[in-house]
Amino acid sequence: MDVNPTLLFLKVPAQNAISTTFPYTGDPPYSHGTGTGYTMDTVNRTHQYSERGRWTKNTETGAPQLNPIDGPLPKDNEPSGYAQTDCVLEAMAFLEESHPGIFENSCIETMEVVQQTRVDKLTQGRQTYDWTLNRNQPAATALANTIEVFRSNDLIANESGRLIDFLKDVMESMDREEVEITTHFQRKRRVRDNVTKKMVTQRTIGKKKHKLDKRSYLIRALTLNTMTKDAERGKLKRRAIATPGMQIRGFVYFVETLARSICEKLEQSGLPVGGNEKKAKLANVVRKMMTNSQDTEISFTITGDNTKWNENQNPRMFLAMITYITRNQPEWFRNILSIAPIMFSNKMARLGKGYMFESKSMKLRTQIPAEMLANIDLKYFNDSTKKKIEKIRPLLIDGTASLSPGMMMGMFNMLSTVLGVSILNLGQKRYTKTTYWWDGLQSSDDFALIVNAPNYAGIQAGVDRFYRTCKLLGINMSKKKSYINRTGTFEFTSFFYRYGFVANFSMELPSFGVSGVNESADMSIGVTVIKNNMINNDLGPATAQMALQLFIKDYRYTYRCHRGDTQIQTRRSFEIKKLWDQTRSKAGLLVSDGGPNLYNIRNLHIPEVCLKWELMDEDYQGRLCNPLNPFVSHKEIESVNNAVMMPAHGPAKNMEYDAVATTHSWVPKRNRSILNTSQRGILEDEQMYQRCCNLFEKFFPSSSYRRPVGISSMVEAMVSRARIDARIDFESGRIKKEEFSEIMKTCSTIEDLRRQK
């Protein structure tokens, strides 16, 4: 039967059908090759938006820098970064006037955080630019390398374990005339394999010491590495994102902590909350504007889009904001918060890997690294690349480009939201002093603006005033991409509002299906996703039931675990049939062992093992969950695990699911190919950290784990803990005298070894 799809929508308001227009089925586009071109685009664009600013030279690194602050205001609609300091400060003052004590209180909260934060805060996060090796590394490794280098250069404040002390080392390192680092390199040699008698290339990893002078070190400390943003849907062009090094990260973290604290107190801020809480916040603002506009006023909403938000922001403006926000605070606190914007005003963008060239005729491929772009003959490049390189050349130093204006993506989301909200705050009648007034929502670069006025002319005047106010603060509302509607219908951060929020179900599509963790986790994650969407996203019972059946089918095909009585032949079917035949209670078999599916939409909250436990044969229970069975996962499984969900928009979300340790919760082994690369040393370091942390956790089980007070090393803490525990166990008769004295002897030996070291 043919169905005309338009018939489906006859009774559905357009907003409710919005899901069908989103590009979220199928694989998202990924980037290949280098991000060098995209990064050059970003650098060139940023300078173009600020081109009428003042040029200066950085005295330490010699990098040319463009400062657009208080520059000439644009005459036309072009995006520009000429924020006016006095306007920004005034907007901050008005924000404080409307929210008495907001800055003061946020500063006090932040000061507490600053004094308590441990340096391990910086291990969170994925890829981080590791300045010691000049490339990206996992955050924990990059931090470890930084601390290792600091200590070998007699920078030891970080040993207290407090982030603020680590940052003292960072500050001091920038005053050093030279910094000695350890670099990894590879040696290759041909040797004969004893077993196969073939010649093989053996790689050994060497470490060598290397001195950086002050200028080179500063360039590295101020460098942001760039990559291409992957998996962006609905765009034809890719774009560059930045990952900062460890020197910058700690300072940014404190600034964002302060800004987050302010955002939490602002009703127009879409950050830091998310999900249903965010929707409630938005609905409140809409309700306020609707109720006040009953008979006398009309109300319109702009679904806003800003042109190149990041590239027109300016770190110098953020410095002005911070200086104002912290103006009555102690000197040390003001200093530590002002460093991040100062570093960003002097930042360098690493251009990535460079360009790949291939000659079809000669079957040759060669890479031109970014460092060579400064002086290579441009005849090899096509016209558009030639223009890019010519433009960026004056800014290049050692393969990095000086990029003073602009912010890179995602660095100061909270602080830039405060800036945006300060403009929304100016819409109150006591500030506009006329018949129109506005309010709205701001979440990083996304905004919705609600304008109320007695007539259309008033609405137009209000929008114009908002537009011009934004320009004064370096924010460029795009007239082409923003659209206006009667209040009651708008979109904000991919939430569609039509007298209430409609579910945008397509955003959740990527998280349906089999995750590929292991049989146990995948079953749990799959049903939890369906459950969550029934709660949050209008997934109705019939559709949910269908989603569940599709999921089970998908799961069985993924793990080749069709029911024991099926005709489908797979590699596992022989074993599964054997198990099926010898099982008395077949309903008790897990789906991954060829059992039937007992899930329906009423019991999605129960882990499968629990759901079927009473139905299982006793010997099957014994094999499945026996702690003595070597195949039962012995990772200490918490009762709640976290899966990382990649929604269509925004950052990866953490999703909790129930976990039961069984023979199906296996952990795959690491791919061996890494063991032959220069990453091997890093891998060994990582394993060492892992072992140390595991050992530490054995001494301090999480229930009794208090952050160490005072300054003691992990070893000292463990030794003193061992002594206390041993004494308690000995006195209560849990251990014998010989064991007690052996423990004490071991503790003393460890301390002696530490002293000798």
Curated annotation (Swiss-Prot):
Q: Name the keywords, alphabetized.
A: Eukaryotic host gene expression shutoff by virus, Eukaryotic host transcription shutoff by virus, Host cytoplasm, Host gene expression shutoff by virus, Host nucleus, Host-virus interaction, Inhibition of host RNA polymerase II by virus, Nucleotide-binding, Nucleotidyltransferase, Phosphoprotein, RNA-directed RNA polymerase, Transferase, Viral RNA replication, Viral transcription
- Annotated region (Promoter-binding site) at 249-256
Is Phosphoprotein found in the keyword set?
Answer: yes
Which biological processes are named by the entry's GO terms?
Answer: DNA-templated transcription; symbiont-mediated suppression of host gene expression; symbiont-mediated suppression of host mRNA transcription via inhibition of RNA polymerase II activity; viral RNA genome replication; viral transcription
Which top class of enzyme applies to this chain?
transferase
Q: Which compartments is it annotated to reside in?
A: Host nucleus; Host cytoplasm
What is the protein named?
RNA-directed RNA polymerase catalytic subunit
Species: Influenza A virus (strain A/USA:Memphis/10/1996 H1N1)
